[in-house]
Amino acid sequence: MNLHEYQSKHLLKKYNIPVPASEVVFNPDAAVDAAAKIGGDRWVVKAQVHAGGRGKAGGVRLVKNKEELKSAVKALLGTRLVTYQTDERGQPVNQILVEQTSDIARELYLGAVIDRASQRIVFMASTEGGVEIEKVAEKSPEKILKVTVDPAIGLQPFQCRQLFFGLGLQDLKQMRSFTDIVMGLYRLFTERDLSLLEINPLVITGSGELICLDAKINIDDSALYRQSELREMRDTTQEDEHETMAQQWELNYIKLDGNIGCMVNGAGLAMATMDLIKLSGGDPANFLDVGGSATKERVTEAFKIIASDKNVKGILVNIFGGIVRCDLIADGIISAVKEVGIDVPVVVRLEGNNAQLGAKKLADSGMNIIAAKGFADAAEQIVKQVGVIA
């Protein structure tokens, strides 16, 4: 789960991590009130979306008076911001962060992530702040400093100092501030079950202060059950509606750009199914794993999600009956085709537990459901059917 910048900074403040004074607003008049509360004569207007690259897309603007402020907020609210991290439709702008300006002398990068290779938290820092860290990693990986946290003892102050001096910084007052910030970020990361935390940029002001100018936080979805405060921060308007619907039924769904819908039980089999569709000349429209405990209801909902994608021209169901019974899957398929009114070709491959009974139910249903003879045949059949439609 992702947080907006204003939500991330709200958490940072709880851990005594310095951020600029700011207010989130939902209409232009509130922006003027927010500016008066913040003070000063210049402000930064930031569109709140779950995507990077806002500045280049016009989603971050410097305003020099309250008339410009009101105009900028009015121009952004209710629009969809398209950045290099969004699709062509962009993300809806429903909130604006009005923030005080900062006297920036230097921009740095600071982040933390769970490294799957070492199975530990890794803190990263770079002198290349204010730019996409992915580009730095690609072009100049030597500019990214890393320290790995031993989970038995946690992050240590000497590791913070190691990053500080590695960034070419020397001032002792800044060293203490930097150490406090990194230690605070570590507490935030571990106590709130984060999977990603980025401060980009961490700025040094003209007066030598360190301030977190932007913040990005991702939370481990598997830990949300114990993070009630963070659960309330979820903004489903920033998420794909199909993926949101799938989560409600505990379905693992990821939308893709193809036209062949896939419904499979098991993540490995689902990926193999997509590979075989590609090898057969087709393009998968999604990854959808109904899981090992698939029920008739979940299969029906899975069909609804796939069918709601207007790009889908055919559906391939690939089920291996280990834990799940193929006859129950067949019941779900029949129910879904009737209820949803599927008007595209459906190819089904059933193998394993009660596969013959499931195939018989499909054959006796009287519906236009194509039974495949095997894995490869299923992929070839659906690609052929979709090709006929195209």
Curated annotation (Swiss-Prot):
Similarity comment: Belongs to the succinate/malate CoA ligase beta subunit family.
Q: Which GO terms describe its molecular function?
A: ATP binding; magnesium ion binding; succinate-CoA ligase (ADP-forming) activity; succinate-CoA ligase (GDP-forming) activity
Which cofactor is recorded for it? Mg(2+)
Task: Provide the organism lineage as a comma list.
Answer: Bacteria, Pseudomonadati, Pseudomonadota, Gammaproteobacteria, Legionellales
**What's the protein here called?**
Succinate--CoA ligase [ADP-forming] subunit beta
SUPFAM superfamilies tied to this protein: Glutathione synthetase ATP-binding domain-like, Succinyl-CoA synthetase domains
Which residues take part in binding Mg(2+)? 200, 214
The pathway it acts in is: Carbohydrate metabolism; tricarboxylic acid cycle; succinate from succinyl-CoA (ligase route): step 1/1
Class in the EC hierarchy, top level: ligase
One BP term from GO: tricarboxylic acid cycle
Annotated PANTHER family: SUCCINATE--COA LIGASE [GDP-FORMING] SUBUNIT BETA, MITOCHONDRIAL, SUCCINYL-COA SYNTHETASE BETA CHAIN
Cofactor binding note of this UniProt entry? Binds 1 Mg(2+) ion per subunit.
GO cellular component, as recorded: cytosol; succinate-CoA ligase complex
Source organism per entry reads Coxiella burnetii (strain CbuK_Q154) (Coxiella burnetii (strain Q154))
Subunit composition and interactions: Heterotetramer of two alpha and two beta subunits.
Q: Pfam families attached here?
A: ATP-grasp_2, Ligase_CoA
Which chemical reaction does it catalyze?
succinate + ATP + CoA = succinyl-CoA + ADP + phosphate; GTP + succinate + CoA = succinyl-CoA + GDP + phosphate
EC assignment: the record states 6.2.1.5
Q: Where is the ATP-grasp domain?
A: 9-245
| UniProt keywords, alphabetically | ATP-binding, Ligase, Magnesium, Metal-binding, Nucleotide-binding, Tricarboxylic acid cycle
Give binding positions for substrate. Answer: 265, 322-324
